[in-house]
């Protein structure tokens, strides 16, 4: 299923740093430190992207992560303020369960999952993160789950039915 690329310049994106990691390379003269930053960008209206930036300084790593995230933007189908159906995302040993929730529930999620969902514009959702607690795996499992979401219209088209037949309305 071919999708048109999303132009990051047309959207009002806000970025959010999920995790910063300091790594050390041991050299003859001691340790040389560098940083990696996991960054999430989103417009709060169904577009979100994640990126990993690496540099010798934290601000530069964050900037690179933001640029990478803007290149990885994708669309999240929303039904009002929640997701259309329950979905399970996998990455490595990380698993993230996303369930739609009623109005007023809020985003019941922690850490990396919350950052992605809020950036995407999801306001009411229940989540459960299982397996790996590594922010990289949790973040990528959340993204994998969001990419598996299908709108009611897409599901109807794939099954050769009308949207009203699927929703039971």
Curated annotation (Swiss-Prot):
Signal sequence, renumbered to the chain: none
Domain text: The N-terminal domain interacts with the head of the 30S subunit; the C-terminal domain interacts with the body and contacts protein S4. The interaction surface between S4 and S5 is involved in control of translational fidelity.
Source organism, top-level taxon: Bacteria
Gene name in the database record: rpsE
Keyword set includes Coiled coil: no
Family: Belongs to the universal ribosomal protein uS5 family.
Protein name: Small ribosomal subunit protein uS5
Keyword rRNA-binding: yes
GO MF entries: rRNA binding; structural constituent of ribosome
Stored InterPro entries: Ribosomal_Su5_D2-typ_SF (IPR020568), Ribosomal_uS5 (IPR000851), Ribosomal_uS5_bac-type (IPR005712), Ribosomal_uS5_C (IPR005324), Ribosomal_uS5_N (IPR013810), Ribosomal_uS5_N_CS (IPR018192), Ribsml_uS5_D2-typ_fold_subgr (IPR014721)
Organism: Anaeromyxobacter dehalogenans (strain 2CP-C)
Listed GO CC annotations: small ribosomal subunit
UniProt keyword list: Ribonucleoprotein, Ribosomal protein, RNA-binding, rRNA-binding
Any one of the GO BP annotations: translation
Subunit structure: Part of the 30S ribosomal subunit. Contacts proteins S4 and S8.
Entry function: With S4 and S12 plays an important role in translational accuracy. Located at the back of the 30S subunit body where it stabilizes the conformation of the head with respect to the body.
Segments forming domain S5 DRBM: 13-76
């Amino acid at each position: 299923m071919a999708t048109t690329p999303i132009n990051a310049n047309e959207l009002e994106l806000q970025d959010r740093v999920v995790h910063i990691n300091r790594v050390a390379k041991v050299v003859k003269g001691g340790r040389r430190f560098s940083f990696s930053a996991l960054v999430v960008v989103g417009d709060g209206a169904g577009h979100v992207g994640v990126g990993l930036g690496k540099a010798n300084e934290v601000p530069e790593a964050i900037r690179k992560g933001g640029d990478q995230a803007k290149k990885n933007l994708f669309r999240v189908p929303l039904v009002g303020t929640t997701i259309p159906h329950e979905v399970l995302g996998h990455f490595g040993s990380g698993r993230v369960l996303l369930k739609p929730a009623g109005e007023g529930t809020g985003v019941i999620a922690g850490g990396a999952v919350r950052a992605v969902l809020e950036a995407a514009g999801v306001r009411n959702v229940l989540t459960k993160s299982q397996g790996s607690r590594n922010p990289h795996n949790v973040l990528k499992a959340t993204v994998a789950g969001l990419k598996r979401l299908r709108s009611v219209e897409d599901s109807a088209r794939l099954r050769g039915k009308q949207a009203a037949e699927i929703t039971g309305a």
